[in-house]
Every structure is written in C-alpha cells, then in structure tokens.
From Swiss-Prot:
Residues in the Vesicular compartment per record: 347
The protein's name: Syntaxin-32
UniProt entry keywords in alphabetical sequence: Coiled coil, Golgi apparatus, Membrane, Protein transport, Transmembrane, Transmembrane helix, Transport
Transmembrane spans: 326-346
Free-text function comment from the UniProt entry: Vesicle trafficking protein that functions in the secretory pathway.
CDD domains: SNARE_syntaxin5
Classification of source organism: Eukaryota, Viridiplantae, Streptophyta, Embryophyta, Tracheophyta
Gene: SYP32
UniProt record similarity statement: Belongs to the syntaxin family.
Membrane topology: Single-pass type IV membrane protein
Annotated region (Disordered), positions in chain: 172-191, 208-251
Length: 347
C-alpha cells in the first residue's frame, strides 16, 4: 500500500526547475558571457560580444592618441624654452634640431592614427542603425572631434615655435654679419698700425749715404740707427705671417658654422611647410565635421518644428473634444447600456 501511495504522489517538476534556473540566470547575469552561450540566442550574443570588442578597441585607440598628444605637448614646451634663448653663445642648435625632428614625426604619426580612428568609427556607424548605435556614434564622433582640436592646437603651437626659432636665427645672423663687417673695417692689430714706421725706415734706407755727398759730420748720427730700423722689419713680417695663419685657421671654422646654421634654418623652414600641410588637412577634417554638425542641427530644428506642430494639433483636438457635450452624453449612454446588458444577460 505504501509503494502504491508513493507512486501515485510522484510528479515530474523538472520543467519548473529549469524555468526557475533560467529566470535566476537572466536576473543575475544579464550580459552575455562565454559560459552561458548555449542557453541564449547565439546570434544575439555574438553581435553583443562583437559590439563590446569594437567599443573597447575604439576606446583603446582614443586613449593612446590622447596620451601621445599629451607627451608631444610636453616635448613642445621644452622646445619652446630652448627656442626662446637669444644669446649667441648659448644656442643649443643640436638639441633643438633633435626635438624638432622627434615632434614632427610624432605629429605625423598622430595625424595618421587619427585618420585611422575616424575610418574605424565610420565603419562602426555603417553597421548600426538603432537608437543605441546612434548614441554610441554621437559619443565616438565627439571623442574624435576633441582629439582633432587638441592635435590642431599642438600643431599650431609647434608652427609658432619654429617661426620664432627662424626669426631668432635671422637676428643672430644679422648681428654676426654686422660685427664681422665692423671688424674688417677697423683692424685692432697694433703691428698693422706700425706700417707707416716701416715705410719711414724703408725711405731712410733709400736716402744716399752722407759720406757719398762728402758730409762727414752727419755720418756719426745716422749710422747707429740703421741697424735698429733694419731689425724692426723681420718682427713685422713675423707678426703678419702669424696673423695670416690665424685668419686661415678661422676660415674653415666660420664656414662650418655658417653651413650648420644654413642647414638648421633650411630644416626649420621645411618643417614649417610640412606642418602647414598637416594643419590644412586637420582643418579640412574639422570643417567636414562642422558641416555634418550643421546638417544635424538643421534636422533637429525641422524635427522640433514638426513636434511643435503636432502638439498644437493635439491640443486643438483636445479642446474640441472637451467642449463637445453631446459626445460626452453619447459615451455616457453607451456605458450605461453596456452595464445594463452585462447585469441582465451575463450576470
């Protein structure tokens, strides 16, 4: 009897158990995961997973670009401090050239990365059509625009620093030419000023000897001074040779310095030209985004006008309904008739 009673009271409640488990699983883990893919729709879970991967990839690229722009700005501030030095004897040309090349390469790489990020965002916008995808597209467009403006400001600042550097180099060159021309006009060598004395000594040597004219009284006065005057000419020639050797040694140094300054100036000017092209490209991208924003603004204005028109029409219809008493009486009679039919025939 007990066995029969146990068999009659048995009931399979596996379906209820699975339903409870499914409900708890959805309430605890609403997001799709790898371990519960068999319980849900595989296609929807795959789309959500791909969406999350694309979103994380976009955020990763945007964060890397923002960090690189910040590092480039720090290097640019260091370059600005070096370029502000106006002393001829404290001119870090080598360090300025190295920083200029590094910053130019970083700005070019950032520009390429920003173009790739914009293409990646456009590919994401083409895939999504619902409201959620449109919100994400608006957010990503805002991030890209912010990065564009930051890179544009950095490029403009870099161009201003290079322009200031070019002006300082031109000022230094004009000063150097001014001092070199003054030095060539007014020589400060004391031996050069003694050239008239040497001419006098040569003239005294060309005068005929006193005893040749028969005047023996002046011979005792002129003969002792001739050796002294003759000894001054070798010293003068030696000093002139030393001066010429020093000038010949200074010529290669001046040529090397002038060549280095010319190369530095040419590098700065070519960098400014490349930055102008990058700045023009960024301005074109920003203007395109501005045109898109203008079109969106116009669409929003049209939508707002349509909503206001619909609201006015609904308010007018509401006023017409509320003022129609005959319609209210009809509705009241219909309700009374329905209630009477329900009470007499159904209940």
């Amino acid at each position: 009897m007990s066995a029969r009673h146990g068999q009659s009271s048995y009931r399979d409640r596996s379906d209820e158990f699975f339903k409870i488990v499914e409900t708890l699983r959805r309430s605890i883990a609403p997001a799709p995961a790898a371990n519960n893919v068999p319980y849900g729709n595989n296609r929807n879970d795959g789309a959500r997973r791909e969406d999350l991967i694309n979103k994380s990839e976009f955020n990763k690229r945007a964060s890397h670009i923002g960090l690189a722009i910040n590092q480039t700005s720090q290097k640019l501030s260091k370059l600005a401090k070096l370029a502000k030095r106006t002393s001829v004897f404290d001119d870090p040309t080598q360090e300025i050239q190295e920083l200029t090349v590094v910053i130019k390469q970083e700005i070019s790489a950032l520009n390429s990365a920003l173009v790739d990020l914009q293409l990646f965002r456009s590919s994401q916008n083409d895939e999504g059509n619902n409201s959620r995808d449109r919100d994400k597209s608006t957010h990503s467009a805002t991030v890209v625009d912010d990065l564009k403006y930051r890179l544009m400001d950095t490029t403009k600042e870099f161009k201003d620093v290079l322009t200031m550097r070019t002006e300082n180099m031109k000022v230094h060159e004009s000063r150097r030419q001014l001092f070199s021309s003054n030095a060539s006009k007014e020589s400060t060598n004391p031996f050069v000023r003694q050239r008239p004395l040497a001419a006098k000594a040569a003239a005294s040597e060309s005068v005929p000897l006193p005893w040749a004219n028969g005047s023996s009284s002046s011979s005792s006065q002129l003969v002792p001074w001739k050796p002294g005057e003759g000894e001054s000419s070798p010293l003068l020639q030696q000093s002139q040779q030393q001066q010429q050797q020093q000038q010949q040694q200074m010529v290669p140094l001046q040529d090397t310095y002038m060549q280095g300054r010319a190369e530095a100036l040419h590098t700065v000017e070519s960098t400014i030209h490349e930055l102008s092209s990058i700045f023009t490209q960024l301005a074109t991208m920003v203007s395109q985004q501005g045109e898109i924003a203008i079109r969106i603004d116009q669409n929003m204005e049209d939508t707002l006008a349509n909503v206001e028109g619909a609201q006015s029409q609904l308010a007018r219809y509401l006023n017409s309904i509320s003022s129609n008493r005959w319609l209210m009486m009809k509705i009241f009679f219909v309700l009374i008739a329905f209630l009477m039919i329900f009470l007499f025939f159904v209940a």
